[in-house]
Amino acid sequence: NQLFFYNTFTYQFNLPPFFSAAVPVLNQLKNGEYNKSPPLTSIRVLKSLAGQNFKHFAKTGEWGKDLYSDLVSGELKSSIKVETWNHQSGDEVNLPSVCNSTQSTLSAKYIRLPFSVYYSSYEDHSKFVVAYSERSSQPPIPYVCIGDINRQ
């Protein structure tokens, strides 16, 4: 049901009848439907075949807030560094870093890897989040998020 929070832009959709019956939300997505009324966000725990738990965050465009600073950092109870594609276009404006007394959401502008690779978020289309501790006396927080939403 997490997919129902996305307004998907699907080029082609092949939905076999057995999938449609087993997962009815796929038929709704095929018809261009998605969640437009509260709740406009959803957090679910997904479990891998190996038993590892993953938190999945979903939101609709109607929510009108930043996924990372308004949902992810609060749920993780951690400050986060967010790297997303930094291309502004039309009415999409890159969001600034958000610093407050409990959790900060910082926009990562550059990535420097140990094997002499360096690139900026302007050139990179990936999206990821790394949780961190603002106090050097606290151990790092063990969260890494992989996403598909820009901070715009």
Descriptions of predicted regions:
Residues 1-152:
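PLD/PLD-like phosphodiesterase catalytic module centered on the HKD motif
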